[in-house]
Design a protein with these regions (language model features):
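Ankyrin-repeat boundary/"N-cap" motif
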Residues: 1-9, 32-44, 68-76, 99-108, ...
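Conserved ankyrin/ankyrin-like repeat signature
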Residues: 18, 54-55, 85-86, 116-117, ...
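Ankyrin repeat domain, specifically the short helix-to-loop turn at the C-terminus of the second helix
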Residues: 21-28, 57-65, 88-96, 119-127, ...
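A generic tandem-repeat structural signature
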Residues: 56-111
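Ankyrin-repeat-protein effector appendages
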Residues: 123-131, 201-204, 208-276
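Conserved small/polar residues in nucleotide/adenosyl-binding loops
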Residues: 280-284
Length: 285
């Protein structure tokens, strides 16, 4: 902002004498400050976003209500922006958080690169075992091995696969590692017990993702770990019989070409089909 309201400027400048004068003049710390047309924050909220520990204590000591915030509960903001000392100040807010907000608390730790806050959250009842699956999958997807290892050690579900806005297809962490061609991560997850047979809602599993990415080394590694019958043509024919696929379609999926071109279309120029042996059935779930 080019200019800040007087109270916000005093907080950002850590101008204690100015704030004391404003308080003597009747400043109410529980009234939000309009920072722009669409943004307003509580005074304490500004201090938490700035991780200004002395200012946070000053405002609390002068009556700021820790339960008031415009963006989200201050425990979540502190988990992202501050250290354990500040997170502990708002730990009692755990009691009013929804399960989704508790999941977000672990995500805030990931976004803010504040793994040191996990212990405080756990002590407050926001355990990684119960609420850390979403953050674990995201950490794996972005290749953050250190955080993924920490969350797994704390009890995160290695096979967590609920859908969310980032992962609407409900993949597992190991499927995401395969999608990003992260062979070391895939190996590590499997060593830790990841289930490579769990498919997302479109039928993709780590092996099929590796094949789609033309990552032969990863595909070969995963294929060797899957049930042999999943890669047997006769077994696939048996599995697909209830679907009554036309014989010509089955033959086409065996021989290709699997890439269909639509050069005259404006929006969709091509589509790529699954090969016959990659077709997903409920038997392979």
């Amino acid at each position: 902002w080019e200019t800040l309201p007087e109270t916000a400027a005093a907080i950002c400048d850590h101008d204690i004498p100015k704030l004391e004068a404003l308080l003597q003049g009747g400043l109410d710390l529980d009234v939000p400050i309009q920072l722009s047309e669409y943004i307003k924050l509580m005074p304490l909220e500004i201090a938490v976003f700035r991780n200004d520990v002395p200012m946070i204590h000053f405002l609390l000591e002068h009556g700021a209500d820790p339960g008031l915030a415009e963006e989200q509960p201050l425990l979540l903001t502190a988990a992202r922006c501050c250290g354990p000392e500040v997170v502990a100040l708002f730990a009692e807010q755990t009691a009013i958080l929804s399960p989704k907000q508790k999941e977000r608390a672990i995500q805030e730790v990931r976004w803010g690169k504040r793994p040191e806050n996990i212990q405080v959250l756990e002590q407050a009842g926001i355990t990684v075992e119960k609420f850390g699956g979403e953050a674990f999958r995201a950490a794996v997807s972005e290749g953050n091995a250190k955080l993924a290892r920490l969350l797994l050690e704390k009890g995160a579900d290695i096979n967590y696969h609920k859908p969310d806005m980032v992962f609407p297809n409900a993949p597992t962490a190991v499927t995401e590692a395969a999608r990003h061609k992260n062979l070391p991560m895939v190996r590590w997850l499997i060593e830790q017990g990841a289930d490579i047979t769990i498919a997302d809602k479109y039928g993709d599993r780590p092996y099929t993702v590796a094949v789609q990415n033309k990552n032969q080394e990863l595909a070969d590694y995963l294929k060797a770990l899957e049930p042999e019958e999943w890669h047997n043509e006769q077994e696939k024919i048996r599995q697909l019989m209830p679907y009554k696929l036309p014989a010509k379609l089955v033959e086409y999926l065996k021989t290709g070409p699997l890439r269909l071109e639509f050069p005259d279309q404006e929006w969709v120029k091509w589509a790529e089909l699954y090969s016959f042996c990659l077709l997903y059935t409920s038997d392979a779930a």
